[in-house]
Amino acid sequence: MPGKIAVEVAYALPEKQYLQRVSLQEGATVEEAIRASGLLELRTDIDLTKNKVGIYSRPTKLSDTVHDGDRVEIYRPLIADPKELRRQRAEKSANK
């Protein structure tokens, strides 16, 4: 018989951070942890078909299993391409 595990679900915005602790059955998935956290109802900007997720900064799939003590992270979409930003900064410093 599977036991209970404790997992944290995190979502960070520039102005506010959300950290929810949930208790799940062993064998639960990343998606189940996120749904149990209530963040999908609290933050309508989270779309699991678009937002990437991870466990302790390592990208993962919604179907991956969580383990006791894991921190599931929901990542915001990038608003700018990092390569493009680096190129623009390099051009700007070259023109000085």
Swiss-Prot record:
Disulfide bonds: none annotated. Coiled coil: none annotated. Belongs to the UPF0125 (RnfH) family. This is Protein RnfH. It comes from Escherichia fergusonii (strain ATCC 35469 / DSM 13698 / CCUG 18766 / IAM 14443 / JCM 21226 / LMG 7866 / NBRC 102419 / NCTC 12128 / CDC 0568-73). The gene is rnfH.
